[in-house]
Each structure stands twice: as structure tokens, then as C-alpha cells.
């Protein structure tokens, strides 16, 4: 078919949420002529739900995005109203940063970045059709019948894909925050042969700040100690004039109001059909599932410095409006609350992610990539991480360069993508630290050490940033070597000073590095005895040193496991293998292999329902094929 294209691009990104922004910025920064098309320009990088970035596991993802050359970390560092390190009382593997965002400023600042980006065109347009010829993407068609050509297309439509808002007895076509839904494109994706699922998510009501009695709530301040998402942000730029959040709780009256109105709750009346998020349930779902609980936490989170809107975290609901008002006013501190926006649920179509490769390219259509909530995930950070990987791989494909696949041992982003393409998901997928088997080496403090080199090689990390990274890397390696070479001896003067600090005296000589392995010995304490490095160390280098030294044994064990798994990850499975040709594998394994078409032996081993015996048989089969080829040659 001949198309009359209005404009020609290398890459077109459909949707400008958190996934679409990262995808389009990555592609354009890698030199590809890119179009970012979105239904509404005012909603670029908009936060339709929580006004925050980061949190458990998610905060580590933001640092990974930053280390690879993405934008989310830089943007939130410019626009936060509160910053807090979570899980400080736990081990380093689960610590993560979380920021309250100035919601409007975050979107506005990101829009300015996109508008100024070279090679990137921003267009308000509804995309109705992905144009495909001979199994390959060739472009898109808009609702106004404009056609644009592209060598790759990235779909990042979020919850707009056949979106429907549900509120009490009401159900109507809509994207998030009452934006337009994308219905024709949803039909088009199904027609192209993609399997489509249906998920649901929700958001809580917003209340007016001046109507809250804060004296009845508990203040939740940010951290005084500087922390940042971007490794390029400076401690001296840390915002100290932070805005607090506030803690309150539901109570028995709140629960009674919900229980008395369950017949009007879409979750229980049958109106909601989509599968909701396990780790972010609605308040009505929590009351029913955890009936023994007398109260549930609610955090009152300001949506910015220049707005009265306050997000009631923990009160996601699709109950009718009148019930929401009664529910709010049953809560301590909210007795006179004015509801500015109602909570609601939203159902939307997703592309079932087992149809994707680890590059996030679809297996059905060459050059078509999907990312974000379109793939069945929840959360801005998960979306941004996928968008970055999809944008990078779309650009690499256009340029004819090797693809980027992040392994489970490389990044939480790699864990997430592997989970999606290998196991699929039956509910909105959320990243958790428990999903990562190598979480001690996937920490927030070493994201730059893990990924900056990759970002530099693909062209997203510039020379200035790379030079700063190399300097930090050298500082870390030199200081580690120095600490391992200096001895502390159990002489009386040294032990006296150690005891004065409240620590146990030395019984044997040991290196400064060994001394730092003691739980209570920080880098600052150690350098009191052995002196400082020749030049002052970056605070991020000191944090990295302390973690790497104290957990050295555990980290080494994790790296040994990675090395063993690497052999399986490097064993490729031919793309057009005939699974019926392999004798003796279990029926369930054969069915799963046919459905997912794993690309490596390692991926095959992680498919649910596949046992070690199946993998052994597959390994023997692959080795036999390889020997057969050698004999033919």
C-alpha cells in the first residue's frame, strides 16, 4: 500500500507520560529524528495519581534511569517539595529515596526540557492507527488522517487505551483526569494480532488544605541531610525549605460508612471488570479484606507549593461522591474537609507483556515497541524505566547497532522487564525489592557504578558527566586500596582512643578496611585513626565505601551467583525453534515455551511451571543442535 506521508521520522513515540518522555528524549539524544505525539500537551509528564517520585525499589529505579542518561531524576531534583530516605533502619539493599513533587512544576519543567531538545518534535495529536507493512512498522495515522512515517514506533499510552472512568454507578469513556480515551488505537492493536488484557487502577480524593485541622494529625517532615536522585545534583542546591506531609488514620466510623455502602461500590457491584493492583488496593477493598484492622494509615500529601490540593494517600476509592464526602469527614483532622476532586477508578487495555522481547519490541511486529502501563505495570518510575529502555532500543534498531538488554543482575529495570516478558502479569505489576534476587548489588548508592558506562557507550551520558563519574570511580578505588594497606595495631594509645569512643579495643592488628567492617565504625571514625585521603571525597563515594566494605562478604557471594547464571544467560535459543521437536519435556513446559519463546536458557529457567529437568533436556537438545551444525560445516 502506498502512503502519502506528511512528515518522515526515524522514531515516533505515542503518548507523553513518564514512559513516553523518557523514550522520546533517549531516541532524540541518540541522534534519531523523533516525534512525540500526545492527546493533550498540557498533560506531558503529568501525575494523575500520587504527587511523588521514588519509594521502596522505585527510588532505585529513578537512580538507574539517571545513571543511564534519563531525565526523571534530574527533573524531580529541581521540583521536589520534600525529600526523604526510606528504610534507614534497615540494610542498604532496601534503602530508597522518595520525593514529594510539586506536581504542576514537575510537568512544566519536563515540558520545557522536551521542547528544547534537539531532534525532537512535540505534537498534539490522537494516534488512531499503527501502519504496518509485511510485518514491519512504517508509520502512524492520526485521528485527523495525517500520516507520519517511522522506522520504529514506541507505544506509551498509559491508562488512556480504551480508558473508562468509574465513579459509583457512573462509567464513561475517559483517560486519566478526564482526558480523552484512545479507543480506535486499542482496536487497531487487537487487529494487528496483539493479545490485549484489561486492568484497573484508582486514585483517592483531593481535599482543600485550608479545610484540614492539622493539629489532629502527625507531622511527617523531610530529611535535613542532603539527598538527590541525580548523581549530578549538588549538596549545596538541596532545598531545606521543605513542605511537610501529615499522618492520620481511618477509624471504626470510617469503616462503618464503607460497609454500609458496599452495595454502591463498583468494586463489589460488578461494574468494575478489570484486575486491580494488589499492592495499592482501594480503601473499600482493604476494609473487606482486612476486616480485623481497626484503622488504616492515611498520608496527607500537598500537591505543590502554590495549590490548596492535598492528596489523601491510602484512600483510593471509586465510591459515589456523597459517600466519599462522608468518609472524608469521619477521619480525624478532616472533619470539615472540602473535597476538591473525587476519587475514581479507571479501567484500561494493556498489551500482555509475554508478547515482548527483552528490548520491549513486540515479537509480532518488527519495529513496534511498548512501554509503561501499556505493558501492565503500575507507577511512574516503572513506566519511565521501560520508556528509557524502549527508546534506547528503538534508536539502536534504527541505527543498526546491537540492542541493549539489561540483565537481572544489572538493574531493577532489568528485573522488571525480565519478569514481564518471562512471567507476564495477571495484575498491575509493581516493583518490590523482594523481586530482585541480587538486591545487595542493585543498591541506590551504586547505580552510577553499575550503569553510567552503559549510558556513555550508547551516547546518553555526555563527556562532562562521564568525567565526573570516572573521577568518583577512581576516588573509590584508590581509597579502598589505601584503607586496605594501612594497619592499626593494638597498642595502648590506639585502644584508649577506641574505648573513649565507646567501641571494643583491638586484640590483633588489622587494616583500616577490616576496622570499618565493624557495624558501628563509619568512614569518619576510621579516618580519625588513619587520616583522610589526599583530596576530599565526594559524599556519594563515602557512602559507597561504607556499604562495599561492611557487606563485602555478602556482595562477593552475590557476584559468584551472577557469574554462574551468566553462563545460562549467554546460551541463546534459536528464534524459530520447533518446541515439538524436543522429546521428554513436560507438557506444561512445552506450552509455556511456545507461548513465551524464551531467548536464552536463563530466561527459560525462570518461566513458572518449568522445572530443572525440562531445562536439562533443553540444554542437551541445544548442545546437540550445535554439534550437528559443526558436523555439517
UniProtKB/Swiss-Prot annotation:
GO terms for molecular function: flavin adenine dinucleotide binding. It comes from the Bacteria. Coiled coil: none annotated. Its cofactor is FAD. GO terms for biological process: tRNA methylation; tRNA wobble uridine modification. Keywords: Cytoplasm, FAD, Flavoprotein, NAD, tRNA processing. FAD binds at residues 15-20, 127, 182, 373. It is found in: Cytoplasm. Homodimer. Heterotetramer of two MnmE and two MnmG subunits. PANTHER family: GLUCOSE INHIBITED DIVISION PROTEIN A (PTHR11806), PROTEIN MTO1 HOMOLOG, MITOCHONDRIAL (PTHR11806:SF0). NAD-binding protein involved in the addition of a carboxymethylaminomethyl (cmnm) group at the wobble position (U34) of certain tRNAs, forming tRNA-cmnm(5)s(2)U34. This is tRNA uridine 5-carboxymethylaminomethyl modification enzyme MnmG. It comes from Streptococcus agalactiae serotype Ia (strain ATCC 27591 / A909 / CDC SS700).
Amino acid at each position: 500500500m502506498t502512503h502519502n506521508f506528511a512528515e518522515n521520522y526515524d522514531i515516533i513515540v505515542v503518548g507523553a507520560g513518564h514512559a513516553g518522555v523518557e523514550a522520546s528524549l533517549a531516541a532524540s539524544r541518540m541522534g534519531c529524528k523523533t516525534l512525540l505525539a500526545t492527546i493533550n500537551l498540557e498533560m506531558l509528564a503529568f501525575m494523575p495519581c500520587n504527587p511523588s517520585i521514588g519509594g521502596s525499589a522505585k527510588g532505585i529505579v529513578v537512580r538507574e534511569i539517571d545513571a543511564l542518561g534519563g531525565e526523571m531524576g534530574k527533573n524531580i531534583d529541581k521540583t521536589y517539595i520534600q525529600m526523604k530516605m526510606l528504610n534507614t533502619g534497615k540494610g542498604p539493599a532496601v534503602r530508597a529515596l522518595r520525593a514529594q513533587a510539586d506536581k504542576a512544576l514537575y510537568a512544566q519543567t519536563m515540558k520545557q526540557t522536551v521542547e528544547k531538545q534537539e531532534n525532537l518534535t512535540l505534537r498534539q495529536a490522537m494516534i488512531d492507527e499503527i501502519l504496518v507493512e509485511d510485518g514491519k512498522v512504517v508509520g502512524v495515522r492520526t485521528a485527523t488522517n495525517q500520516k507520519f512515517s517511522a522506522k520504529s514506533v514506541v507505544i506509551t499510552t498509559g491508562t488512556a487505551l480504551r480508558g473508562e472512568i468509574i465513579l459509583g454507578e457512573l462509567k464513561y469513556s475517559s483517560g486519566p483526569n478526564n482526558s480523552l480515551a484512545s479507543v480506535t488505537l486499542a482496536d487497531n492493536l487487537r487487529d494487528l494480532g496483539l493479545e490485549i488484557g484489561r486492568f484497573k487502577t484508582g486514585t483517592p480524593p483531593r481535599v482543600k488544605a485550608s479545610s484540614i485541622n492539622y493539629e489532629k494529625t502527625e507531622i511527617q517532615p523531610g530529611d535535613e541531610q542532603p539527598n538527590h536522585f541525580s548523581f549530578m545534583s549538588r549538596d549545596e542546591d538541596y532545598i531545606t525549605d521543605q513542605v511537610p506531609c501529615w499522618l492520620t488514620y481511618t477509624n471504626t466510623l470510617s469503616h462503618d460508612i464503607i460497609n454500609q455502602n458496599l452495595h454502591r461500590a463498583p468494586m463489589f457491584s460488578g461494574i468494575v471488570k478489570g484486575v486491580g493492583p494488589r499492592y495499592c488496593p482501594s480503601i473499600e477493598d482493604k476494609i473487606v479484606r482486612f476486616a480485623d484492622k481497626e484503622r488504616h494509615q492515611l498520608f496527607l500529601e500537598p500537591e505543590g507549593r502554590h495549590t490548596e490540593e492535598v492528596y489523601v494517600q491510602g484512600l483510593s476509592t471509586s465510591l459515589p461522591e456523597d459517600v466519599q464526602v462522608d468518609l472524608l469527614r469521619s477521619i480525624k483532622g478532616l472533619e470539615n474537609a472540602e473535597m476538591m476532586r473525587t476519587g475514581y477508578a479507571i479501567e484500561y487495555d494493556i498489551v500482555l507483556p509475554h508478547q515482548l522481547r527483552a528490548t520491549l519490541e513486540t515479537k509480532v511486529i518488527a519495529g513496534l515497541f511498548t512501554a509503561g502501563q501499556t505493558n501492565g505495570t503500575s507507577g511512574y518510575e516503572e513506566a519511565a524505566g521501560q520508556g528509557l529502555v524502549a527508546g534506547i532500543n528503538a534508536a539502536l534498531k534504527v541505527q543498526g547497532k546491537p540492542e541493549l538488554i539489561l540483565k537481572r543482575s544489572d538493574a531493577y529495570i532489568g528485573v522488571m522487564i525480565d519478569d514481564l516478558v518471562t512471567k507476564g502479569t495477571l495484575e498491575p505489576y509493581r516493583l518490590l525489592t523482594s523481586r530482585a534476587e541480587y538486591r545487595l548489588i542493585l543498591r541506590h548508592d551504586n547505580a552510577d557504578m553499575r550503569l553510567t558506562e552503559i549510558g556513555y557507550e550508547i551516547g546518553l551520558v555526555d563527556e562532562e558527566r562521564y568525567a565526573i563519574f570516572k573521577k568518583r570511580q577512581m576516588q573509590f578505588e584508590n581509597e579502598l586500596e589505601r584503607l586496605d594497606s594501612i594497619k592499626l595495631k593494638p597498642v595502648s594509645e590506639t585502644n584508649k582512643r577506641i574505648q573513649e569512643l565507646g567501641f571494643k579495643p583491638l586484640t590483633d592488628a588489622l587494616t583500616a578496611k577490616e576496622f570499618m567492617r565493624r557495624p558501628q565504625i563509619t568512614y569518619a571514625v576510621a579516618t580519625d585513626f588513619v587520616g583522610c585521603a589526599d583530596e576530599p571525597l565526594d559524599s556519594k563515594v563515602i557512602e559507597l565505601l561504607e556499604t562495599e566494605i561492611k557487606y563485602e562478604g555478602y556482595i562477593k557471594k552475590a557476584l559468584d551467583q551472577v557469574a554462574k547464571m551468566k553462563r545460562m544467560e549467554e546460551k541463546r535459543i534459536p528464534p524459530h525453534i520447533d518446541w515439538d521437536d524436543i522429546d521428554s519435556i513436560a507438557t506444561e513446559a512445552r506450552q509455556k515455551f511456545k507461548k513465551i519463546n524464551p531467548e536464552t536458557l536463563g530466561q527459560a529457567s525462570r518461566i513458572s511451571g518449568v522445572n530443572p529437568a525440562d531445562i536439562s533436556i533443553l540444554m542437551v537438545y541445544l548442545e546437540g543442535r550445535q554439534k550437528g551444525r559443526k558436523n555439517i560445516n
